[in-house]
Amino acid sequence: MSGADFQLRQPTILIVDDDASLRLLCRVNLELEGYNVLEARSVADAEDAVAGDEVDLFLLDVHVGADDGLALMRSLRARDHGAPVVVFTGSAVLDSATIAEADGIVPKPFRLEQLLDVVRRLAPHR
């Protein structure tokens, strides 16, 4: 394989949130940063995305509609997925176990630069 044939794969980020406007805001800005972005509006959609695509970072709401986003995080950990998980939360209080399990916490509402700083740290371009 020549150097011209070799292409670096950009990190893929899966945004799991039931808020369509938040997903859009994140997707557009992450794509501008050069990331591949997938979206899921439910835990079931996220499970489907994980089965079909290689995900390098999860951006996961604590409450995804009626679903428990933290249960998805624990399921990913149990399957030894390996990709970092960043938790979005509008809750002022998270228990210490949740904080310890997540690779990053982004409180809602957040500034875009807060999110991008966490993403750049956990899913750097290769």
Go through each PLM region and give its residues.
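The feature encodes the CheY-like receiver
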Residues: 65
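Acidic, metal-coordinating helix/loop segments flanking the phosphotransfer/catalytic sites
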Residues: 39-57
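Active-site residues of response regulator receiver
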Residues: 61
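Charged docking surfaces used in two-component/phosphorelay signaling
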Residues: 24-32
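Acidic catalytic/metal-coordinating carboxylates
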Residues: 42, 68-71
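Hydrophobic/aromatic residues positioned on beta-strands within the core alpha/beta folds
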Residues: 88-89
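Short amphipathic alpha-helix used as the core "switch/output" element in two-component signaling
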Residues: 48, 70-81
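Non-catalytic signal-transmission and effector/linker regions of two-component phosphorelay proteins
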Residues: 1-14, 74, 113-126
